[in-house]
Amino acid sequence: MEIAHSINKRQSNLYLIVIILSGIVFFIPFLGRVHLFDWDEINFAESAREMIVTGNYHRVQINFQPFWEKPPLFFWLQVASMKLFGINEFAARFPNAITGIITLVTFFLIGKKHYDEKFGMIWALAMLGSFLPHLYFKSGIIDPVFNYFIFLGIYCCANWIEGKKQNGKFALLAGFLIGLAT
């Protein structure tokens, strides 16, 4: 019994490694090869750059004017990336590539929990091979980060409502995650 558990654990770890490496191979290469092209990409990267220039990380701004339309989390992630990689296209898009990898891992773990490892792997690979998510995870727009936290918040809320987690911790976590997105 112990050997079977050990083999299953190794197989699960192997699946996770394959998913993470696949995400790295699919989402990270050539992030900075193309100029920022979309209004959102350009302005979001500029907002992060302006945070660095002014040192004001509490207020999102464009052209040094307040920009209240978007929540700050994504811009903070871009700032961290720009501080690590410099102010460039790669740094503006890197947070979404990491979010893409984390999304794949999350899908695998949720699929494994509710069905089995095979389902989790198929779900993660289906997401990996889908055109629109692939495009989003290689962009510098807010949607992947926003969608990830909204998805997790709804998932936590659904578990709480179903009664799997009767205490309020899942409800609080759902609110916190949705709050991060918005």
Predicted segment positions?
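Membrane-integral, polyisoprenol-dependent glycosyltransferases
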Residues: E2-T182
